[in-house]
């Protein structure tokens, strides 16, 4: 048998591969593609992988495999890679299971992916209301377990406190070189200082004025900036420098010199100071340090050298300039801060492209219209309606003592309710403007003044004037009440007419405006979509004259006399003779003037303040006497039931309560100026009505009057006269903080190209980008939340460059890997900033700058100790050294030590941020693991109940007060069934 088989074997030809027509149906390549066994490369990746590590890296390493001929085979490979995403192993075993079942957790994760970025009070279009309501309902119950889970993490951090002392050898060597080079920079300053003054950070007087930084002008932009790289083939990615990067990296001495480049020795800053004469010149790092003081703990320690110089000015007296240089190295530095210094350099190289553009081409700040969304009428109308409800009356939280303009003539801005307009805001013009988007206004009396949107402070000023004059003004005389029935009601009818705009002239009572014609005739249109007011004498149009001798109005036109039933202010008392109209009194020589006083007019309707929705044809709407007296302008009466002082006190009590108004619509805008010029002064400046819609909202987007002279506002610096940096860029900007001018030297870290606005998507510009490295110790549990200092850093960048977008690079401190790149838009940053007391931060900044302004010429040192509310001001010794002198060199003679603290620097997690294993396994962040599938019935019962019992409240307080993260584990992964056993 065997011999026969041997004889028959040569008949088989094994060299010919089997074929089916022209295509090979079985080959070695097909075998590899269809085989379920892993390839050699996959086996090598699996053998070198850490336990619990995301296998996205393995997918990138297998990209060099032969191309898959079938789409289904490619999907199988993706599923295999994703399927190997393991749940990380906890550092400390979980104490219990979650109250939510696996199905409930997966359902909530799906909803969290959809609606996590949507604000709670937003009116997003295209969302499923039922799902969104379900998400909000589940979120309430999830937050209860999140609180308990954060308490568990805090206790776990105490058990693993040694994790926070971890610092690799490379990181220790790198940070030591940087810190030693920074210590050498300290020797540039004086060695001995004597204590000059001790003051409080907040000052000894409370601040009640909301303030902010207002960008006056971008003076100079030098250097270039690189593009940011935000897309990587796999995550997490190892942060390490390549050979090319190591060759191009700066030395520690160069890095320290760039960090401590004094603005007092900057020739560019000296030239700009001599031209623009700011009181303060500081760096962006010193600005952040002065803002990063959060009470009541004030945990940050810092020392800032200050140089005060007096520079001569041609044709004027010398000017004192305060130079605030960059902060000195810290005396104490945590391991987390050292780790961040080490990881910041490779992250910078990894997220940078090779291409760069001049920094002068970057769209750093918002344009003069400040918001492109104002072109979108539907969104503007909604926002106006909200603003009008919140800003209907005075805001006594604001300091308006400097806003009184008694004896100063102002314009009269009239508004009329229109059923077609949902909500409007009057514009500061010479002629009355109807609250229509398409209103056309012609103002020949002052043609150089165009229509512009009024800011919130102007509206507050005008309303304050009305309240003050209602109480104090007694100059109107009783003669204006003689014809109360026909005059008062007639003017009130004109005001409350729902089909026609109020007809008034708002000319400026200046020396030129006092020579106006005796009669001005105004055209009114009863159309709901368009109203044109023309201030030319025209016999074809109805005219409105006011006789100042008898104060009687004669209205020509049938439409203005038909609104007897729509009168909203129908009170008839003898006290109505109190009419405050100084212009009428001054012009009582027989000349005729236009209707109304010199203050801005208001229609007698509760919906007529700062963009209120119009009344329409509501004829039966009643208005209280208080509202009618506050809102109507043509004739101001004090009613019998109206106690001016009492009502003002009531309004003050109501308005002193917390309101839901957003404080900083734009972080860099100055919401309230304590020394704001009068309305007449503001109208004297140029304004561009063509770039503004006719009805804008009264928010921080309005452009206030600048503090620079017009010749300096339009002056363009010649970059060839200035010294550009060899690497990077310098941007010099001029800001105003109340009555202070600040010259800030900053830089743009990275840029990206994106559409200029939501409406103009085809126009793409370069915008600034700021990347914040964040070293974390709890990646096995989730993503750590931003601390107060990190939020303040992002906020400071938004102050300097209002068009900035932000990225937070979450870095695992144990593996040195970037495991999440979080993008934060400007809108999301505004929501996060609610955790900061921005008004207090500005108050501290202003108090320190005011204190520095009172010092004499010389060199000083600002010193703040950790957890201290006081500020020490040292002055450089003039050769006289005492025992109490502060030796700066001795203090910074060695490397900074590690602060000793009894508590672990733990930071709570952010329950709204999802990691890949959360999405893949359907696990809610910051919650305990669910029970196994074997107890499905019990799980559903326990999950649907969703216990609402409250847990210990001190948990949230502790997590809120803590400011640093917790631990991580190198072996994070564990099989799902093992996770459930724990």
From Swiss-Prot:
Low complexity bias locations: 597-610, 684-697
What tissue specificity is annotated for this entry? Answer: Expressed at low levels in lung and testis.
Q: Which InterPro entries match?
A: ICE2_C
This protein's GO CC annotations:
Cajal body; cytosol; euchromatin; histone locus body; nuclear body; nucleoplasm; transcription elongation factor complex
The lineage's top-level taxon is Eukaryota
Which residue stretches does the UniProt record annotate as biased composition, category Basic and acidic residues?
479-497
- Compartment(s): Nucleus
Record has Cell cycle as a keyword: no
Q: Which residues get modified to Phosphoserine?
A: 17, 326, 571
Tell me the segments the record calls region Disordered: 410-450, 473-504, 595-623, 672-697, 930-982
Mind listing the UniProt keywords for this protein, alphabetically? Nucleus, Phosphoprotein, Transcription, Transcription regulation
Q: Which residues carry this modification: Phosphothreonine?
A: 573
Here the segments flagged for biased composition (Polar residues) are 410-427, 611-623, 672-683, 956-970
A GO BP term here is:
positive regulation of transcription by RNA polymerase III
Subunit and partners? Component of the little elongation complex (LEC), at least composed of ELL (ELL, ELL2 or ELL3), ZC3H8, ICE1 and ICE2. Interacts with ICE1 (via C-terminus domain). Interacts with ELL.
Give the family, as the similarity comment puts it. Belongs to the ICE2 family.
Family matches, as PANTHER family: LITTLE ELONGATION COMPLEX SUBUNIT 2
The task this protein performs is described as: Component of the little elongation complex (LEC), a complex required to regulate small nuclear RNA (snRNA) gene transcription by RNA polymerase II and III.
Name by which UniProt lists this protein:
Little elongation complex subunit 2
Organism per entry: Homo sapiens (Human)
Q: What is the lineage of its organism?
A: Eukaryota, Metazoa, Chordata, Craniata, Vertebrata
């Amino acid at each position: 048998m065997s011999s026969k088989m041997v004889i028959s074997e040569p008949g088989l030809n094994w060299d010919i591969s089997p074929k089916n027509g022209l295509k090979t149906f079985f080959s070695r390549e097909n075998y590899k593609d269809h085989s379920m066994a892993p390839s050699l490369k996959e086996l090598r990746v699996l053998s070198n992988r850490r336990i619990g590590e995301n296998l996205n890296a393995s997918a990138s390493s297998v990209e060099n495999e032969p191309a898959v001929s079938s789409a289904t085979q490619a999907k199988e490979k993706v599923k295999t890679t994703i399927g190997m995403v393991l749940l990380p192993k906890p550092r400390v075993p979980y104490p219990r299971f979650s109250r939510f079942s696996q199905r409930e957790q997966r359902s909530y994760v799906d909803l969290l992916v959809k609606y996590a970025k949507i604000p709670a009070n937003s009116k997003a279009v295209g969302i499923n209301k039922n799902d969104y309501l379900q998400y909000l309902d589940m979120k309430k119950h999830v937050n209860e377990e999140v609180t308990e889970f954060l308490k568990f993490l805090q206790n776990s951090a105490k058990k693993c406190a040694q994790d926070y002392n971890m610092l690799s050898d490379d990181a220790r060597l790198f940070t030591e070189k940087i810190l030693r080079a920074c210590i050498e920079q300290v020797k540039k300053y004086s060695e001995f200082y004597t204590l000059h003054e001790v003051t409080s950070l907040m000052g000894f007087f409370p601040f009640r004025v909301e303030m902010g930084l207002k960008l006056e002008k971008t003076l100079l932009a030098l250097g270039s900036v690189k593009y940011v790289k935000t897309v990587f083939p796999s995550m997490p990615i190892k942060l390490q420098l390549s050979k090319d990067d190591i060759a191009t990296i700066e030395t520690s001495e160069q890095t320290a010199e760039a960090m401590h480049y004094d603005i007092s020795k900057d020739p560019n800053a000296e030239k700009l100071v001599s031209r623009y004469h700011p009181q303060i010149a500081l760096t962006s790092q010193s600005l952040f340090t002065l803002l990063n003081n959060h009470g009541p703990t004030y945990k940050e320690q810092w020392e800032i050298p200050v140089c005060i110089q007096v520079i001569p000015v041609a044709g004027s007296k010398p000017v004192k300039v305060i130079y605030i240089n960059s902060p000195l190295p810290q005396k104490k530095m945590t391991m987390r801060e050292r780790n961040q210094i080490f990881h910041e350099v490779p992250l910078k190289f990894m997220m940078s492209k090779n291409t760069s553009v001049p920094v002068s081409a970057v769209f750093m700040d918002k344009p003069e219209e400040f918001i492109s969304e104002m072109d979108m009428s539907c969104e503007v109308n909604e926002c106006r309606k909200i603003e009008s409800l919140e800003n209907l009356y005075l805001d006594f939280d604001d300091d308006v003592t400097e806003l009184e303009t008694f004896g100063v003539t102002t314009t009269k801005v009239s508004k009329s309710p229109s059923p077609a307009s949902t909500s409007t805001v009057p514009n500061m013009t010479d002629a009355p403007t109807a609250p229509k988007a398409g209103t056309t206004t012609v103002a020949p009396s002052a043609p150089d003044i165009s229509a512009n949107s009024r800011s919130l402070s102007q509206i507050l000023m005008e309303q304050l004037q009305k309240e003050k004059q209602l109480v104090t003004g007694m100059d109107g005389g009783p003669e204006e009440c003689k014809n109360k029935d026909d005059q008062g009601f007639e003017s009130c009818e004109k005001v409350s007419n729902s089909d026609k705009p109020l007809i008034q002239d708002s000319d400026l009572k200046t020396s030129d405006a006092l020579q106006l014609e005796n009669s001005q005739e105004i055209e009114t249109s009863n159309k709901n979509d368009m109203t044109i007011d023309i201030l030319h004498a025209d016999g074809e149009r109805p005219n409105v004259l006011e006789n100042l001798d008898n104060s009687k109005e004669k209205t020509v036109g049938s439409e203005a006399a038909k609104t007897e039933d729509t009168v909203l202010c129908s009170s008839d008392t003898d006290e109505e003779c109190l009419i405050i109209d100084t212009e009428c009194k001054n012009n009582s020589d027989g000349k005729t003037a236009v209707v109304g006083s010199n203050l801005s007019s208001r229609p007698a309707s509760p919906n007529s303040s700062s963009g209120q929705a119009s009344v329409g044809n509501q004829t039966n709407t009643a208005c209280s006497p208080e509202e009618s007296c506050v809102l109507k302008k043509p004739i101001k009466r004090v009613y019998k039931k109206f106690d001016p002082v009492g009502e003002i006190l009531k309004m003050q009590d109501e308005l002193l309560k917390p309101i839901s108004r957003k404080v900083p619509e734009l972080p860099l805008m100055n919401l309230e100026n304590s020394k704001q010029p009068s309305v007449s002064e503001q109208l004297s400046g140029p304004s561009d009505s063509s770039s503004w819609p006719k009805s804008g909202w009264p928010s921080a987007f309005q452009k206030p009057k600048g503090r620079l002279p017009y010749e300096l506002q339009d002056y363009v610096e010649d970059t060839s006269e200035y010294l550009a940096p060899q690497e990077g860029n310098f941007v010099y900007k001029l800001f105003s903080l109340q009555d202070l001018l600040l010259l800030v030297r900053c830089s743009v870290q990275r840029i990206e190209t994106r559409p200029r606005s939501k409406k103009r998507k085809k126009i793409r510009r370069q915008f600034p980008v700021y990347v914040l490295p964040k070293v974390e110790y709890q990646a096995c549990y989730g993503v750590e939340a931003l601390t107060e200092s990190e939020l303040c850093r992002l906020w400071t960048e938004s102050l300097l460059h209002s068009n900035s977008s932000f990225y937070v690079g979450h870095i695992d401190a144990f593996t040195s890997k970037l495991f999440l790149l979080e993008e934060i838009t400007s809108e999301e940053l505004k929501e996060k900033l609610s955790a900061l007391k921005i008004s207090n931060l500005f108050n501290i900044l202003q108090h320190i700058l005011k204190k520095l302004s009172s010092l004499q010429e010389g060199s000083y040192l600002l010193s703040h100790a950790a957890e201290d509310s006081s500020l020490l001001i040292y002055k450089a010794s003039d050769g006289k050294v005492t025992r109490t002198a502060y030796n700066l060199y001795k203090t910074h003679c060695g490397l900074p030590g590690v602060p000793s603290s009894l508590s672990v620097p733990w930071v709570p997690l952010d329950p709204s941020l999802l990691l890949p294993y959360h999405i893949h396994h359907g696990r809610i962040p910051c919650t305990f693991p669910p029970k196994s599938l074997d107890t499905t019935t019990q799980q559903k019962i326990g999950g649907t109940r969703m216990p609402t019992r409250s847990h210990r409240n001190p948990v949230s307080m502790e997590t809120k007060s803590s400011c640093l993260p917790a631990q991580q584990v190198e072996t994070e992964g564990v099989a799902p069934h093992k996770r459930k056993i724990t």
